[in-house]
Structure formats: C-alpha cells, structure tokens
Curated annotation (Swiss-Prot):
Keywords: ATP-binding, Cell cycle, Cell division, Chloroplast, Hydrolase, Membrane, Metal-binding, Metalloprotease, Nucleotide-binding, Plastid, Protease, Transit peptide, Transmembrane, Transmembrane helix, Zinc. Its main location: plastid. GO terms for cellular component: chloroplast membrane; chloroplast thylakoid membrane. The active site is at E516. Residues 74-123 are annotated as: Disordered. In the N-terminal section; belongs to the AAA ATPase family. The gene is FTSH. It is found in: Plastid, Chloroplast membrane. It is an enzyme of class 3 (hydrolase). Pfam families: AAA, AAA_lid_3, Peptidase_M41. ATP binds at G293, P294, P295, G296, T297, G298, K299, T300. One of its GO terms (biological process) is proteolysis. This is ATP-dependent zinc metalloprotease FTSH, chloroplastic.
C-alpha cells in the first residue's frame, strides 16, 4: 500500500502518535508571530530497534520535500515537483514485533507525475475550511495570503483561481501548509493605513475634547441650563420654582385664624398691584418680610396665598436647596436666583425654612470659611448690598427666629417680621370650618366646643383632627362624622391609639383608677386651676390612664403663670402618688415617674428663673452659655457657687414637699369621693367633665383653702 508524504505527515499531525517521526530541519519560511511554527515533534522510541528503516525513509522523504520547495527552485522559475511517495508492502507488516503500523521493508520511490485536475476544486470565491484542507493535502493550492489579524486567508489554486477562507483557531494549519509545499505570506494592510492611523490618533482626542466642551456649554447656558435636562454646571444653578402667573389655588380667603398676619401681607400684595398709591406719599416697597411662628401655624400657606393674590412672577425654594455637595454652590445658587428674579422684577422670592442658611455666624466651629457663611454672606449682599435689589421682595419663613443672624434681621433686608402665632378660640373655629368643607357632619358637632377643647392647636393640628375623625367614621361604617368621632380622634392625637387588645388585670385596673382619680380630685379642688374635662383608664400609647384638663385660653395666649398656679400644678401632679398610698406604702408603683419629673422641673424653674424663692431672691441663675452652634459661648459655666447650689436644692425640695402635703390633705379630707370616683372609673373606664362635677356636687366637696 502506497502513502504519499503529505498523507503520512498529515496523519502524524492529526494524532497518529504510533508512527514515530525523525527530527527534521524546518523549512525557512517567514511567518507572522501569532502563527505556530512548530512542524514536527520527534518521537524517539529507544526500545524499538525495528523502526530504523521507517525513520530512514521518512528522513529521505523530508530531504526530498525540502529540496523541491518553491524557495529552492525560485532561481530556475520552475514549478515545484510533487512530493515523493513512500511505498510500504502490506505483506511485510508485523504488528506483533513492532510498534509501527508499517513493516521494516519500506522502499522510497520517486514520485509519479500526475496531472492536476481543477474539476475537484470547490466552486465559488468562498471555501469552507474543510474544503481548503482537502485541496491543500491534494496539492491543489499553490499559495495562501493571510490577513493581518490571521482570521481570513486568500488562496491561489494551481489553476489560478482565487478564493477566501475563514480561518479557525487551528495550531496545526501552518505545519500542514508547509509540509504540502504551499507558499505562505501575510498581508501588511492597505497603503493608506499609516496615514489613517496618524489621522485617527489626532481625531479621537479632538472628538473627546469637543464632547466635553459641548457638555459644559450645555450646563452653562444650553439645553441643560435653567429648565433644561441638567448638566454638570447645574450645581451652581438655583433650583427655585418659577411661576410667571402663579396658580397655587390658595387665596387669603382660604387662610383662617391669622388675621393680623394676613393684614401685613395684604399690604405687600397691594403695594405690588397699586404702587402709585404708596409712592405718591413717598413710601418705599418693603424689601423683605419674615414670617415667624411655631410649626404648623400656616406660614407656607400664607406665602402660597400671597402668590395666588399678587399676580406677579413668583419664585419659591427651600433654603436647604442652596447648599449641595460642592463648596461654593450655595453662594452661586443665591446669585443665580436673584439674577433671575431681577430679570422678572417686580416679583416675589419666597425662601422657606431660611434658618437652614441664615443661622448666626461667629461660632468658629468647622473652620472660618464655612459653606453656610458663604451662602448667608451672598444672601445679605443680594438683599441689600452695594447694587441693591430694586423690585424684588423677599418673603421668608422660619420657626427658629432665635438662631437667625442679626445682620439678616435688620431693616433694609427684612423690614417686617410677621408673627404667625397659634390661633385663639375664634381662629380655631374658623379653621375648623375651613377643614370641614366636603365632610358630612352630624348635627351634634359644635365647632365652638371643639375649639375650646383644643387650646394650643395649630391649623395643621386641627386639619389632622378633622381628617382622623373622618377616618374613624369610615372605619365604623358611618355616613356622618359625629362629636364622638371627633372626641376619639382628639384623644388619639394627644395620647395615642387605644390598646383595645391589652389584657389588664383587675388589680392593675383598680390601681390606675385610683391614680387618675387622685389627679382629678386634687385638680378640681385647687382654686384657680384648670377644670377637669375627662378622665380615662383606657391604655393609650405609653400611658395606662389619662386625666384631661381644659387650660385657660387667656393663660395660654399670654404665657403668664402665677405662683399659686404653679404650686397647684405640682400638687395635682403628686395627687396620683398620694392616691396610690391608700393601698399602703408597699403597694405604690412607678406610674408616677413622669409626674415627679414634671414637679421637679417646675420647682427648679420657680427657684432659678422666676424668682419665687425668698432665699435666692429675684435673681436668675444657671443660665449657661447658650448653644455654641448658634454663635454663642462654647462652654456652659455655672454662674453661682456651690453654697448657692445647696440653697437651690433645699428650696426645690421645700416646694415639692409643700405640694405633696397639700395633695395629701385634700385626698384625706375627701376620701369618700375618691372611692366613688375610682369605682365609677372601674365600671365605665371613662368619665367626662359633667359627670365628674355632678359627683362632686353630690359629695359636697369644698375647695382647698391654704
């Protein structure tokens, strides 16, 4: 059986490792670095001496093959001859005595010239890889030209036709081509590649720079500027909301319970609408108006009403929006806000919660170049600086006027400070009427009674009250909101929701009933003290029971408390502990802990701040250094000696002991009423003020006289 050299070598490379091959000299071929240049792996079998003839034959075949390569015949311009042929006699194979599949008697004969036929070549200009390998092994491929990346090659067949082949990752391809006498070359690319690479190296950085330039231009004034899609320079842009014709849906008619504040702001609105009326008298438009008041009193609502009434351009923002991640953003946004406002003058700029940037300077904490200080300095300059802000009215709101910088509050910046305080009874009635719109109310709902039971409530508190009452009515499947739902909603807001599933033992229930009865009894018999509104032993929140007193409206509005009222307040707070002592000193509980804290706080204020101590006198001590973060003193030093501190402690103890004695005297005198009231609470769990007073009248109780 005859084997061609190409067949023998291809068999060796395709894995026929049982055929030993000698070490040969590799053909000198210029190949790209990424191709594998290993052609043969010599396999030496020292234990088999019968393989020497086949080794000699293979060596001769390789020598003949290398002698007839195109490189060797290039000088004569002759075509390369076909490779030599190894002939092996099949009857000489002796597998039992040799590891080679061939016998030792192998003769090397000259190759027989054969005419190449082009009819066996594939058609088309694109060959499959398997077709390409078959053509190479049959000697029908003259040369190949690899692309620069080695993924594609172009072949030239012996008949001159050309075709392209997609090259897979085959490490044996170069070996196969070399052993079959195929000329190998690599494409160096197009002639213009060098120029293209040079231009590309310059073009890419230019495009990157142009892209960055467009992004920054977009952030400064392009589509990403004010009202745009955003950009990196938007950090310095104000985030204020602008309305050319404000449509807040709120007018002064929707604001109730703040008549004085409305009057002040209505003048500002009238100034914008009718400036000639004021300028004829030489009046100047106020530059700023600061709304001051507790949280929930309607400062922002008033600002929305101003926007709805004025009919002028309106800018609104929160002070916290000025300060961002980067240093200097606050001052930049203040400048941007006032630049836009001046372009729309006359207009109104509303800054909510201005204490976020307007805090007092000079504390020195966090360095002298504090970001907040830069922002407030820029704000001061814009409001009343060298250039002024003609036509721009600044409307601001805060619930912390004590922390604002004095330079911000002076006339010329904030000319007016409008106090928006908690509403009185008449104001609460109007607010309840506003927030009851759209709600189905029963006929027994009396706004005047609700207003008198809610002293100190702000507009937001009353809005929440009516909303909670509506939710309770819906939960109970009612079609109207009655006074019971409003009363339950009020207790829920003050003390928390009822613990309906709480398991309370009879002993604990009795103890809580006596504790609350003690508070109510002492409070009702103290002269000039608040009347009892309701007593309940239903657990709510953290409290096991509650006693509601109706504080005086006049006392709340004025904030003036007499010495007798404070002494009565301490006695009422201690009435619960005194009532628990009915069961013996060993049965008192920790339920009076909050009462003790309240008593101690009131007694210490009476001695240190109010001048109600004869030994200390009319002196305020223990004021401290103030809050260092508000620009005040860092440390809080005592301004009195240790001897004075001992006197203060003794005076506080004396006031508390006196209040305890008064509560004990009242309960011991009216012990029968205490038992009846506690029993009534155990039975009903809730006793209102009218039922409580009827019990007092029946028991012929008398007011305490010191």
């Amino acid at each position: 059986m005859a084997f061609s050299t190409s067949s023998l070598l291809s068999t060796n490379f395709l894995g026929a490792r049982n055929i030993p091959t000698p070490k040969t000299t590799k053909p000198s071929i210029s190949l790209p670095l990424f191709f594998k240049t290993k052609f043969f792996n010599s396999q030496n079998d020292n234990n088999n001496n019968n393989s020497e003839p086949i080794k000699s034959a293979a060596v001769s075949a390789l020598i003949l093959s290398s002698m007839f390569t195109p490189a060797a015949l290039a000088a004569d311009n002759l075509p390369p001859p076909p490779p030599p042929v190894l002939e092996a006699q099949p009857n000489q194979l002796n597998p039992a005595n040799s590891t080679s599949p061939f016998s030792q008697n192998i003769s090397l004969t000259a190759p027989k010239p054969q005419a190449q036929s082009s009819t066996d070549l594939p058609d088309g200009s694109q060959w499959r890889y398997s077709e390409f390998l078959n053509a190479v092994k049959k000697g029908k491929v003259e040369r190949v030209r690899f692309s620069k990346d080695g993924s594609v090659l172009q072949l030239t067949a012996v008949d001159g036709r050309r075709a392209n082949v997609i090259v897979p990752n085959d490490p044996d391809l170069i070996d196969i081509l070399a052993m079959n006498g195929v000329d190998i070359s690599v494409s160096e690319g197009e002639q213009g590649n060098g120029l293209f690479s040079f231009v590309g190296s310059l073009l890419l950085p230019f495009l990157a720079f142009a892209g960055l330039f467009l992004i920054f231009r977009r952030g400064q004034g392009g589509p990403g500027g004010p009202g745009g899609l955003g950009g990196p320079m938007d950090f310095g842009r104000s985030k204020s909301k602008f309305q050319e014709v404000p449509e807040t849906g709120v007018t002064f008619a929707d604001v109730a319970g703040a008549d004085q504040a409305k009057l002040e702001l209505q003048e500002v609105v009238d100034f914008l609408k009718n400036p000639d009326k004021y300028t004829a008298l030489g009046a100047k438009i106020p530059k700023g108006c600061l709304l001051v008041g507790p949280p929930g009193t309607g400062k922002t609502l008033l600002a929305r009403a101003v926007a709805g009434e004025a009919g002028t351009p309106f800018f609104s923002c929160a002070a916290s929006e000025f300060v961002e991640l980067f240093v200097g953003v606050g001052a930049s946004r203040v400048r941007d806000l006032f630049e836009k406002a001046k372009s729309k003058a006359p207009c109104i700029v509303f800054i909510d919660e201005i204490d976020a940037v307007g805090r007092q300077r000079g504390a020195g904490l966090g360095g002298g170049n504090d970001e907040r200080e830069q922002t407030i300095n820029q704000l001061l300059t814009e409001m009343d600086g060298f250039s002024g802000n003609s036509g721009v009215i600044v409307l601001a709101a805060t619930n912390r006027p004590d922390v604002l910088d004095s330079a911000l509050l002076r006339p010329g910046r904030f000319d007016r400070q409008v106090t928006v305080d908690r509403p009185d009874v008449a104001g609460r009635v109007k607010i309840l009427q506003v927030h009851s719109r759209g709600k189905a109310l029963a006929k027994d709902v009396d706004f005047d009674k609700i207003a008198r039971r809610t002293p100190g409530f702000t507009g937001v508190d009353l809005q929440n009250l009516m909303n909670e009452a509506a939710i309770l009515a819906a939960r109970r499947d009612l079609k109207e909101i009655s006074k019971d739902e409003i009363a339950d909603a009020l207790e829920r807001i003050i003390a928390g929701p009822e613990k309906k599933n709480a398991v309370v033992s009879e002993e604990k229930k009795k103890l809580v009933a006596y504790h609350e009865a003690g508070h109510a009894l002492v409070g009702a018999l103290m002269p000039e003290y608040d009347p009892v509104a309701k007593i309940s032993i239903i657990p709510r929140g953290q409290a096991g029971g509650l006693t509601f007193f109706a504080p005086s409206e006049e006392r709340l509005e004025s904030g003036l408390y007499s010495r007798s009222y404070l002494e009565n307040q301490m006695a009422v707070a201690l009435g619960g502990r005194v009532a628990e002592e009915v069961f013996g000193q060993d049965n008192v509980t920790t339920g009076a802990s909050n009462d003790f804290m309240q008593v101690s706080r009131v007694a210490r204020q009476m001695v240190e701040r109010f001048g109600f101590s004869k030994k200390i006198g009319q002196v305020a001590i223990g004021g401290g250094g103030g809050n260092p973060f508000l620009g005040q003193q860092m440390s809080s030093q005592k301004d009195y000696s240790m001897a004075t501190a001992d006197i203060v402690d003794k005076e506080v103890r004396e006031l508390v002991d006196k209040a305890y004695e008064r509560a004990t005297q009242i309960i011991n005198t009216h012990i029968d009423i205490l038992h009846k009231l506690a029993q009534l609470l155990i039975e009903k769990e809730t006793v209102d003020g009218e039922e409580f007073m009827s019990l007092f009248i029946d028991g012929k109780a008398e007011l305490y006289v010191s």
